[in-house]
Structure formats: structure tokens, C-alpha cells
Amino acid sequence: MSKNININVNYLTRVEGHGNIVVEVKDGKLEICRLEIVESPRFFEAFLRGRSIYEAPHITSRICGICACGHTLASIQAAEDALGIKPTEQTTLLRKLLLHYEELDSHILHIYLLVAPDLVGVPSFVPLIKSHPDVVRRALRMKRLCNELCDILVGRHV
């Protein structure tokens, strides 16, 4: 039996975004094990050229529908760094809380929209409405709670 193995998964499914996995084993030794992120460029930097610094957080929040808060906060931090502004401890803590909300929200979407269909043997989330309505209700309830938390933290969910 050969001790050489090459694995190339050129399109990962059930993930947020696009990625590949590359694994190479030579003479029984792992040589390469790599996750490749293959997102297409979206050129948001070009959208920001010539715009007011105040527009950047709003524009960058549209980079991703899953992690809008992270992109918004990165934009705000870049502006603060450029202007030499140091946020207060309270602001920093609120931002961390917002990122924790977003992580929870992302996990809910991942588990219920991307993983649950595979666990019950259906091709997507939609068939779960009939086959597992309790799972769908739980997913919607958790998503609604996350949206309400975001409303409390920043005035609206993104």
C-alpha cells in the first residue's frame, strides 16, 4: 500500500463562504494540510475611496450578511487608529459584547441552516419545515432572540 495520499476538496459545502481543503502525505508523513479561503474579491476598498470617513462603517457593514458587526467595528477601529482616537473602556466592552452576539448568531445559522439538514438527511433547511417543525421553531426562536439582543445593543439588528 502506498504511503502517499493526496486529498483535494475543491469546494466545501455547508460553510459560510467558500473554501478548499488540501492534504498531502508523502512517505507516511504529513507534508501539507491547508484550508484555502477562495472568496472572490468584492472591492469594497474601491467603494470607500473619496467617501467620508463617516460613511465607511455603513458601507463595510454590507460586506457580509453574516458578520456585518465585525466588518463595521473593523472599519470604526481603522478610523479611530487613523485619527488617534482611543475608545473608552465602556465602548470597548460594548463592542466585545456585540462581537459575542454576532458569534452566537453565526453559530445558530451554521447549526440550523447548514448542519441540521445533513444530520436528518435532507438537502436543505426548507424540507425541515415539514419533517422537523420543532427544529425550525427552535431555530427561528433563537434567531429572533439574537436579533432582539442586537436591537438592545445597537438599536437595530443588521
Feature names for model-found ranges:
Residues S2-V158:
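Catalytic cofactor-binding cores of redox enzymes
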